[in-house]
Amino acid sequence: MEIRFLGHACFELSDGDTRVLIDPFLTGNPKAAVEASELEPSAILLTHGHADHLGDTVDIAKRANCPVVAIVELANEIGGNGVEQVFDPNIGGTVKFDWGWVKLTPAWHTAVTPSGTPHTPAGLLIGIGGKTIYHLGDTALFSDMKLVAHRGNAIDVALMCIGGHYTMDRLDAVEAAKFIEAGTIIPCHYDTFPPIETDAEAFKSDVESETSSKVQILQPGETHST
């Protein structure tokens, strides 16, 4: 299993046969590692529809003819924009594929698309390649994060926002790390723009001194193997 960080909150998960793309904000992203036109995903998963997460979803999905998974109101808008394969779960809902599954989890944030569609933001619990990956989405710290790993879903890798201002900051993210108890944490949603600049190395030091989790800091374009 490989996890490639593409900048901001965008990741590509690959088990060798399948490539799953999360929150493909590439065009207009000063930290983007690739052009949207370079990607051929098997599926696109969205945490929510703010411009820095929805990004290039529609263009990529149309070109690659791949499904998009998003919460129901956001999925309806994407389908209305010409994407043929759209899956529309709500919080707590699971969608299964031949490569694995994705479940929408709560996230504390706001969400409205650039065209004005309000919807509920989500986190993503993903099963792929025999691993469980938790992308927290944009969120504040909240205690129900403890429940995400219930029913034996131990988190192998957490993709965690740490930038503050629009989401929890690195100090709250340390508390989130204690709740989630992931094997590895990859920080994201920081340093893309001035309001979310932070010290990722300090986050790594705090997490590794206060929890059993390891932190892998990736630069855009770098890959973590698990």
What residue spans do the PLM features occupy?
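Active-site-proximal loop/helix segments of hydrolase catalytic cores
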Residues: 112-179
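Binuclear metal-ion centers of metallo-dependent hydrolases, dominated by the metallo-beta-lactamase
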Residues: 67, 79-93, 151, 174, ...
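Active-site environment of divalent metal-dependent phosphoester hydrolases
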Residues: 28-29, 50-55, 75-78, 93-96, ...
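Active-site neighborhood of phospho(di)ester-bond hydrolases with catalytic His/Asp-centered motifs
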Residues: 21-23, 41-49, 69-72, 134-139, ...
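Zn-dependent metallo-beta-lactamase
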Residues: 1-19, 26-29, 96, 103, ...
